[in-house]
Curated annotation (Swiss-Prot):
Subunit structure: Homodimer.
Gene: trpS
Binding site for ATP: 11-13, 19-20, 147-149, 196, 205-209
Pfam families, per database record: tRNA-synt_1b
Family, as annotated: Belongs to the class-I aminoacyl-tRNA synthetase family.
UniProt source species: Haemophilus ducreyi (strain 35000HP / ATCC 700724)
Protein name: Tryptophan--tRNA ligase
An annotated Gene Ontology molecular function: ATP binding
Subcellular location: Cytoplasm
Length: 342
């Protein structure tokens, strides 16, 4: 039986956070046995914001080592660096020509980022979703694990795929589509996917690009420094303190409970019972202890991989070769259909 194809990726810009791990990377590991997985380090996307070249190269290898430390296995999944598969850029240009200006203008992430990086509102930032569409459609991905901030981009990917299929897909005598050019991807919903919020502003998602580093727990941060951040995390002023899950009225407490549940596997009912009558300090101490233990093990594995650059190079070169074999098949078909000389 053919496995369903899953594609996902992370930008090598900024240090990955426990939100990236608990919300994405850890779930990717569980997919490897049942799905045909491609996990990319999307460095082409990273340069929509100015990057220091030396830092970008280092960060790209850091992310690769973190993938491996988290349990992503190159013998089970295709792991590669986006810029080493030129078909991504080639297909993106073609798809740009089948995407409308107004569609890109409605993308909320472009509006947010252009406001934040107003000194560098470049065309790459504007057409970012088209490159993301190329990333996905190139491999005929069936499912894509995405966060809430990327769901709109997946929808435009589906629109582009359907538009191209309508124009170039094989049709029967009545004009009904019988064979598509691109697989139209679905959003992959993980059974257990933690959404980790900012420590000091728990109504917004934890982001690796947050300028206030006290909001963020980096995967490579010193565990003791992380513990101090957690102990300063926002809760509330209820008196007496009440530790219960209520995202609307107790966002800070709920965020700490979410982190604890994701690491320990305990249910909210179990955690609420465990902390009944206790102070917020007790909750913060337990969260800090669990996060420190998780990070210590992860960082030990990371260091082993990161120090072996020969291994990292072999993995990303082998991964790029495997990815290119698949990507070329799709791109060749697209070029043929639109009339390019082969």
């Amino acid at each position: 039986m053919t496995k369903s194809i899953v594609f996902s990726g992370v930008q090598p810009s900024g240090e990955l956070t426990i939100g990236n791990y608990l919300g994405a990377l850890r779930n990717w590991v569980t997919l490897q046995d049942d799905y045909d997985c491609l996990f990319c380090i999307v460095d082409l996307h990273a340069i929509t914001v100015r990057q220091d070249p030396i830092a970008l190269r280092k960060s790209t290898l850091d992310v690769l080592a973190l993938y491996l430390a988290c349990g992503i296995d190159p013998n089970k999944s295709t792991i590669f660096i986006q810029s080493q598969v030129p078909e991504h850029s080639q297909l993106a240009w073609v798809l740009n020509c089948y995407t409308y200006f107004g569609e890109m203008g409605r993308m909320t992430q472009f509006k947010d980022k252009s406001a934040r990086y107003e000194e560098n509102v470049n065309v790459g930032l504007f057409t970012y979703p088209v490159l993301m569409a190329a990333d996905i459609l190139l491999y005929q991905a069936n499912q894509v694990p995405v966060g809430d901030d990327q769901k709109q981009h997946l929808e435009i990917t589906r629109d582009i795929a359907n538009r191209f299929n309508t124009l170039y897909g094989k049709k029967d005598a009545e004009g009904k589509l019988i064979e598509s050019v691109f697989t139209v991807p679905e959003c992959f919903i993980a059974k257990a996917c933690a959404r980790v919020m900012s420590l000091l502003e728990p109504t917004k998602k934890m982001s690796k690009s947050d300028d206030n580093r006290n909001n963020v727990i980096g995967l490579l941060e010193d565990p003791k420094a992380v513990a101090k951040k957690i102990k300063r995390a926002m809760t509330d002023s209820d008196e007496p303190p009440v530790i219960k899950y209520d995202q609307k009225n107790k966002a800070g407490v709920s965020n700490l409970l979410d982190i604890l549940a994701a690491i320990t596997g305990k249910s909210m009912v179990e955690l609420e019972a465990e902390f009944e009558g206790k102070m917020y300090g007790h909750l913060k101490t337990e969260v800090a202890d669990q996060v420190m233990a998780m990070l210590t093990g992860l960082q030990e594995r990371y260091q082993r991989f990161r120090q072996d650059e020969a291994l990292l190079e072999k993995i990303y070169r082998d991964g790029a070769e495997k990815a290119r074999m698949r990507a070329k098949k799709t791109l060749d078909e697209v070029y043929k259909l639109i009339g390019f000389v082969g």
